[in-house]
Amino acid sequence: MQHQDVAIIIPSRLSSTRLKQKPLQLIGSITLIERVFKQINQANLEHTYVATDSEEISNIIKKVRGKVIFTDSAIPTGTDRTYEAFKLIPNNQNINYIVNVQGDMPFIEPSSVLKIIEYLKNSEYDIVTPVVKVDRESVEASSNVTVAVDSAGKALYFSRSLIPNGAEEFLYHVGMYGFRKNALEKFVSLKPTFLEKTERLEQLRVLENGMTIGTCLVENVPISVDTEEDLKKAVKFYENISKLGL
């Protein structure tokens, strides 16, 4: 298998504020978390784990021969859960890169994960995250995060507002992060910052502390499931692609 020095970690906490037991919600006959895992597993990376506090989630993943790491339900964020899981990986001294994939993207493309890894390994950024070019109409129809970048693609700021103001094309931020090991260790040691708390975006803690985030372009905006309405959209999308035999 490729990229033996990379760990993919999918944090999946059973409790959810906006959608009850979100990872266990069905899309077709398969749970959300199983769909995410199966998509990511197509990248064919040996060190792929689901980090969870739930026996139910663990059983689902183990039935499809996935690897599970148990983490405390009190862990506050997905990044913290990712780090706690990383510390429990056997022989983790051989892992130099960690990719955090949110457990709410049931149709995420495995190529996006591989692109993050390649970009991270061939750059000097502390962290790499994917973005998609979208028009104003697309981004206004959602509650998504946009990012402003410099000419080299280095992230300057992330916001829940449309940035840059007045533009007609934006960079939609996809919720995946590739960390160098030392960058992940540094991140979890830092306290939440003013901008992070104001925007409710963890990645601003990185920028406020002088660390760097590189962006890599991917083609498609993945469906994220956070609410009942999102779940309905995901089910509808699945039904449509099933009819097409995809």
UniProtKB/Swiss-Prot annotation:
InterPro entries cross-referenced by the UniProt entry: Cytidylyl_trans, KdsB, Nucleotide-diphossugar_trans
Keyword list, A-Z: Cytoplasm, Lipopolysaccharide biosynthesis, Nucleotidyltransferase, Transferase
Sample GO molecular function, one term: 3-deoxy-manno-octulosonate cytidylyltransferase activity
Main location (coarse class): cytoplasm
Alphabetized SUPFAM superfamilies for the sequence: Nucleotide-diphospho-sugar transferases (SSF53448)
One GO BP annotation of this record: CMP-keto-3-deoxy-D-manno-octulosonic acid biosynthetic process
Catalytic reactions of this protein: 3-deoxy-alpha-D-manno-oct-2-ulosonate + CTP = CMP-3-deoxy-beta-D-manno-octulosonate + diphosphate
One family name in Pfam for this protein: CTP_transf_3
GO cellular component: cytosol
The protein's annotated pathway: Nucleotide-sugar biosynthesis; CMP-3-deoxy-D-manno-octulosonate biosynthesis; CMP-3-deoxy-D-manno-octulosonate from 3-deoxy-D-manno-octulosonate and CTP: step 1/1; Bacterial outer membrane biogenesis; lipopolysaccharide biosynthesis
EC identifiers of the protein: 2.7.7.38
Class of enzymatic activity (EC top level): transferase
Subcellular location: Cytoplasm
CDD domains registered for this protein in UniProt: CMP-KDO-Synthetase
HAMAP family documented for this protein: KdsB
PANTHER family listed in its UniProt record: 3-DEOXY-MANNO-OCTULOSONATE CYTIDYLYLTRANSFERASE (PTHR42866), 3-DEOXY-MANNO-OCTULOSONATE CYTIDYLYLTRANSFERASE, MITOCHONDRIAL (PTHR42866:SF2)
Family matches, as NCBIfam families: kdsB, PRK05450.1-1, PRK05450.1-5
Family stated for the protein in its record: Belongs to the KdsB family.
Function: Activates KDO (a required 8-carbon sugar) for incorporation into bacterial lipopolysaccharide in Gram-negative bacteria.
Full protein name: 3-deoxy-manno-octulosonate cytidylyltransferase
The organism of origin for this protein: Rickettsia akari (strain Hartford)
